Amino acid sequence: MASFPSPPLAAAAAAAPPRLAPGLPLAAAAVRRPSSLARRSSIALAAPANPLRCIHRRAVSPRLRRRTEAVGAASAAIGSLGEEREGCLSCFPRGRRRGRPGLARFAPCALPHTYGLSSLHSGLTGAKIRRRHVLHAAGPDEPHVASPTWSETALDKHYVDQPIGKEELEGFLNTPLPSHPKLVRGQLKNGLRYLILPNKVPANRFEAHMEVHVGSIDEEEDEQGIAHMIEHVAFLGSKKREKLLGTGARSNAYTDFHHTVFHIHSPTKTKEYGEDLLPSVLDALNEIAFHPKFSSSRVEKERRAILSELQMMNTIEYRVDCQLLQHLHSENKLSERFPIGLEEQIHKWDPDKIRRFHERWYYPANATLYLVGEINDIPRAIREIEAVFEHTLPEGEAAPMSTASPFGAMASLFAPKLPGGLAASLTGERSPAADKIKPVKRERQAIRPPVEHKWSLPGVAQDAKPPAIFQHELIQSFSINMFCKIPVNQVQTYKDLRSVLMKRIFLSALHFRINTRYKSSNPPFTSVELDHSDSGREGCTVTTLTVTAEPQNWRSAIKVAVHEVRRLKEFGVTMGEMTRYMDALIKDSEQLAMMIDSVPSVDNLDFIMESDALRHTVMDQLQGHESLLAVAETVTLEEVNTVGAEVLEFISDYGKPDAPLPAAIVACVPKKVHMDGVGETDFEIHPEEITDSIKAGLEEPIYPEPELEVPKELITQSELEDLKLQRKPSFASLSKEENVVKIFDDETGIAQRRLSNGISINYKITQNEARVGVMRLIVGGGRATEDSESKGSVIVGVRTLSEGGCVGNFSREQVELFCVNNLINCSLESNEEFIFMEFRFALRDNGMRAAFQLLHMVLEHNVWLEDAFDRATQLYLSYYRSIPKSLERSTAHKLMLAMLNHDERFVEPSPHSLQKLTLQSVKDAVMNQFVGDNMEVSIVGDFTEEEVESCVLDYLGTVSAPKSSKTQEHIEKISFLPFPSDLHFQQVYIKDTDERACAYIAGPAPNRWGFATEGNDLFNVIRSSSGDAQVSESANTDLTERKHNDVRSHSLFFGITLSLLAEIINSRLFTTVRDSMGLTYDVSFELNLFDKLDLGWYVIAVTSTPSKVHKAVDACKGVLRGLHSNKIVERELDRAKRTLLMKHEAETKTNAYWLGLLAHLQSSSVPRKEISCIKELTMLYESATIEDLYLAYEHLKVDESSLFACIGIAGAESGEETTDDELDMGLHGMGPIGGRGLSTMTRPTT
């Protein structure tokens, strides 16, 4: 199930550079991480955040084609297409891609297994980790990558017993940091470097990445985009890579400023014969990187794909990110060498032009090979590397270096007519005579990327740039970014690490400082973020202050942000703040060290790659923790404030003669804004007004920060004892027929309990993550319980509770700091069927009891505030008004509106509905669902039976929950729009300066458990259709056939078959619509399978151009309906099974996946979910036949009378424009524009 984070009012994060050991620290582990988004170090600070972060889960959600996004978080799609749909990740960010509305909440999977754990709120950070400024072209099947950031909680304050002398301290601090003890580095004679790291997770698999140190920054004026083109052609043209697909391997590629990376995630051995796959994987990488075939047919195919990609990714987010980068790096080529390239140049290149660029840059000495995984015999691995690569362009046969002519591509026109060899050297081209020239030793560039920066340093004389303004009709919110650019501080000694720690402590405080300003009913800003980041891609460290706000509040928002920055800079952090954050940081570091053997190989690999790019010392988790402990003992409050103040000087001292000048100030603003009572009016803003607002904020009077009392516990022991005496918690019988108070399944290790107040308990003890646990409360009901007079009440109510963040007598700040101290991440969410509350916690220092205390307080002593209700209402009003400015959301909105017969429960509430809501009505809508037998709590982690059952009895058993629920009786009928209707096919037009197009095709499907609309039980249909065959069966029916009939009667039959079917349809869509017909760059099929509601639907999402989009829609329909004429074959089914089973096997090593499997195990509203669904999942996949898939296919409504389609077209002459008045209801709004480079990476080709 997809997690769709609430818009950015709750967005906040603090992640610090550089993370010196791979893995995901606890406080960030549950934060959704875009795959491959930013392999860099970051200290990010965002505000305002909530202790209870709210996430609404919508029916219309983004595509889920991605791998696991967080350590301990299950893949959002067991069944997205795996090894077959390979391609390039081009110019969209993986993180931002989640914001593209699709119409499927679930990707194909038999059992839902994520309800948002991957989006949990970090108690310290306040929200998700922001990764920025990453122009990154990437490859086909999105990789699972390491977070380049530290969590916002990590280090502990330890004081030395005896004082250390100054000289002794200096000697220690200048000592080099230790290097990773298991990391093996080497270099072949031809210059190819390699790194090998044995790693146990995932078992029996390894990562092989070939990094070529060439990217868009190395392109000449007439080559813009050619590195990305080579990535496409070389990767997708490799026959050896294709042969690996049948082994269960997945592959990918990406390009960005400074490098191109090809990578393969492979089993260690073939399943059938146990053959070692490392030689084949290395051979494929060798072919891809150094021996590609630049055939005309492949070049033309990829040219079409990239041109389609370029138009598709040209969203307003992309254009904003380009503006930010262009102003930040205006003095060098980073401002104009975006990986996707220029359309007019992409049209022109012939194979020879592309081949010459490849010859210039793709050679072994300019590449690094990374091997991480279950590589037990390192000497043998080195021999395999030597055998494959040693003879690839060895030094003695190296081609002469191509010398770039000062005239670039025009050199041949100006060069004199000289003999071939000399003329070629002048033009940079090879001639036959060149082969006789003594070869030149080719080495990689010493500085990557090879650019010069203008640094924002004190006393550096340069002219101040006036604020730049980017204004566009598709921008909804106001945002401003203030940038400071300095050289990267390479972390190689304890002194360097100490500086990082002090910056983290200092910047962590700013989040809470600004948070206190967020308590008013109408805050002037939407979010304020401070990001301090090392970027290997850009070769610099950038500090960014980002402020987003409603356009009418922009002046006040700027003033508040810069005022808080100046206050922190002038007064510094308090002793209490320093101690608090030091404690949290050291705890988090210790937790990470305990998880040293559970970090996925790809996380380790990407961490090493980024660290090497930044020239940071690479340590393992244990070394990182010990080093942090050592430097923590030496940190003083005075030094923390001195180091931190230097980071903020470009803001706090803005306008002073000796202050460091901002590298750029960029405001991104709308052209028109909505004014109550007036409507749309022009939005005017000038650079001098921005400057005046900054200066005005800095002149406001400042006061020091008072110390805040942080609770050590939310429920005292005496209070707990009183509760136990009053409510006498106990475990009750699980069955009315038998007196069974506990069920334990030996095969799965799952235990089931039920409390006397009706709350159901499921738990599983694992060692997947050392001394870490996860917990989820599921409450039945969700938005489906909203009636015609309370539309939006549940979603606004959940958001209101999150916005308040208070419990009992504890303020929101106290609750958040309680989470910080106990390493608790939590989130509050809702969807159409359920309300969720989720936790991730450490088990050290009673962390599990602290998490249970917080859950108890939310259930028993929740606080509903009028100002929080006002903020939540305003938030959804803003989202609604932003719909017409998004092509994808407008198109999806119109389709959903038609398909579900104007049912507002599946979309965002309209302004009319919001006006009807009151604080009491939303409170009632939410809390009426919190009744005992309607609540289920699941816990998974490295705890003991005694620990978990004690917490359950003490904190859940003492909840005074009512014992009966009538929620289901209040669910109004849900139906699809009947045929015929003009709304079965619609079009949306958006006015834009650039042309784009997209389309959604959708239709009814069953739910996960075999129920269709009107409550029809499809198992009865199957039984009745096979009744005649059963009557005529002989008594000697084959045992295998009998067993298969049992599979068809299994409660998960439709979940299994539909997920397999989705895999196959996805594959066919890609092969037909994208690859063969060239009508799209991106097409996907997804299923929305409900658990409780008796319906579901499928969605095909396709992007195209205005001239091709109608053909693309027809082609998609043809694929969808063509499964009868073009029958499924065993090869397709086997590949789909292998993909889903491999993902299932890998995910069972994570706590969050098990948390999802436990969901609804005792839910009365999901009666067909039982323990056999978990135990027999693998068997069900393996047993599925083609006939089974066609049984499921018959219940996907694909005929013309059942199918709905909506085409969206954007352009200057796109027709009648969609307006606010045409929207009866809305979908999730786009987050405020902000953050550098978030959408400029390349999209996946699959």
From Swiss-Prot:
Ligand binding (Zn(2+)): H228, H232, E309
The protein's name in its UniProt record: Stromal processing peptidase, chloroplastic
Family named by the database record: Belongs to the peptidase M16 family.
Annotated GO MF terms: metal ion binding; metalloendopeptidase activity
EC numbers: 3.4.24.-
GO cellular component: chloroplast; chloroplast stroma
Main subcellular localisation: plastid
Required cofactor names: Zn(2+)
Lineage, broadest ranks: Eukaryota, Viridiplantae, Streptophyta, Embryophyta, Tracheophyta
InterPro entries in UniProt: Metalloenz_LuxS/M16 (IPR011249), Pept_M16_N (IPR011765), Peptidase_M16 (IPR050626), Peptidase_M16_C (IPR007863)
Residues of the active site: E231 (proton acceptor), E302
Residues making up the signal peptide according to the UniProt record: none
Biological process according to GO: protein processing
